[in-house]
From Swiss-Prot:
This is Dual-action ribosomal maturation protein DarP. The keyword Membrane does not apply. Transmembrane segments: none annotated. It comes from Klebsiella pneumoniae subsp. pneumoniae (strain ATCC 700721 / MGH 78578). Belongs to the DarP family. The gene is darP.
C-alpha cells in the first residue's frame, strides 16, 4: 500500500508532542512598524529634553550617551541617531522611562495651570481692588495686606498712565512666592 500525501505529514519526526501551552502569537508587520515608530518618537522626546530633565529619567549609560550624542548632532546624522535610539529602546523596558516622562510633562502642565491662575488673580486684584484682596487673604493668610494694596495702587496708576506694568509683575511675583511657600 502506498502512502497518501496526507499520511506523509504524520511521519514527521518530533511532531509527536503537541504543546497546547505554546501558542504562537502572530504579530503583523504593520504593528511591528508602528511599535518601532512609537519608540522612535519616545527617543525624540528624550532627545528634546534638557540635561536636568534627562537626569530625572531612569536611563542606562549606553542609552544616555546615545541621547546626549543626538542632542549635539544636526540634520541627517540626527535622524540616524534617533533610529539607533529607537532600536536601543526596543531591547529595554520602556515603562519606567514613559512614567518618568509623563511625570515631567504633568509637572510642567501643573505649573502652567498655576501661572494662569495667578495671572487671573493678579488681573482681578488690579480690576476689583479690596474685594479681591480679601479673597487673596482667604487663600493665603500669610499675605501682607498693606504690601498688596500698595502694589495694586501702583499698578492702577501705571495702567492709567500707559506705563510699563512693573507693579503688575511685582504682584505676580508676590503671588507666586505665596503659592510656593504654601506648597
Amino acid at each position: 500500500m502506498t502512502k497518501q500525501p496526507e499520511d506523509w505529514l504524520d511521519d514527521v519526526p518530533g511532531d509527536d508532542v503537541e504543546d497546547e501551552d505554546d501558542e504562537i502569537i502572530w504579530v503583523s508587520k504593520s504593528e511591528i512598524k508602528r511599535d518601532a515608530e512609537e519608540l522612535k518618537r519616545l527617543g525624540a522626546e528624550l532627545v528634546d529634553l534638557g540635561k536636568n530633565a534627562l537626569d530625572k529619567i531612569p536611563l542606562d549609560t549606553d542609552l544616555r550617551d546615545a541621547i546626549e550624542l543626538a542632542q549635539r548632532i544636526k540634520k541627517e546624522g540626527r535622524r540616524r541617531q534617533l533610529q539607533l535610539i529607537g532600536k536601543m529602546l526596543r531591547n529595554r523596558d520602556v515603562d519606567p522611562i514613559r512614567q518618568a516622562l509623563d511625570k515631567l510633562k504633568n509637572r510642567h502642565n501643573q505649573q502652567v495651570a498655576l501661572f494662569h491662575k495667578l495671572e487671573q488673580i493678579r488681573d482681578r486684584l488690579i480690576d476689583d481692588g479690596d474685594d479681591a484682596v480679601a479673597e487673596v487673604l482667604n487663600l493665603w493668610p500669610d499675605a501682607d495686606r498693606q504690601q498688596l494694596r500698595s502694589l495694586i495702587r501702583n499698578a492702577k496708576k501705571e495702567k492709567e498712565g500707559n506705563k510699563p506694568p512693573k507693579s503688575a509683575r511685582l504682584i505676580f511675583q508676590y503671588l507666586r512666592e505665596l503659592a510656593e511657600n504654601e506648597g
